[in-house]
Amino acid sequence: MAEFIFRHLATEMGLDDEFEISSAAVSYEEEGNGIYPYAADTLLRHSIPFGRHRAHRITRQEYDDADLVIVMDSSNMRLIRRITGDCSKVHKLLEYTVMEQDEVAGYQTVTNPDEVPDVADPWYTGNFEQAYSDIFRGCRALLYALLKSRKSHHC
């Protein structure tokens, strides 16, 4: 869902050409499968467009080519480290919501990734609405952080 939500938010802001967005799994369990039907239903309810999608496990090349790798939870982070031997560009999605709250409060903290909440996993809870809410908040905060970072790097 995160790929489609982020893409939708970027498109709404006229920034769809600014980012290369893709998603990959950390296991082979869903290899080749399309978007999970309950996830598709949730995206439709929120008017988030999505196209064809086939699950695949992240490759070392994809990791190397990425500027940023966003994961949903601590387990994903550990598995990325196991697959790639690195996690220097890996961040939990909800890390950006914590940073946003800290900025509003007037201070910036360095947060231990283990202290950042995980996105509610609908695979175990069946609650796709909660996952959507977490992912939407995280994607919005991530987009804000990327735009802010881009502005600070221009003269």
What is each model feature region?
Residues 1-66, 145-155:
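Conserved active-site segments centered on acidic
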Residues 74-155:
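Phosphate-binding/catalytic loops
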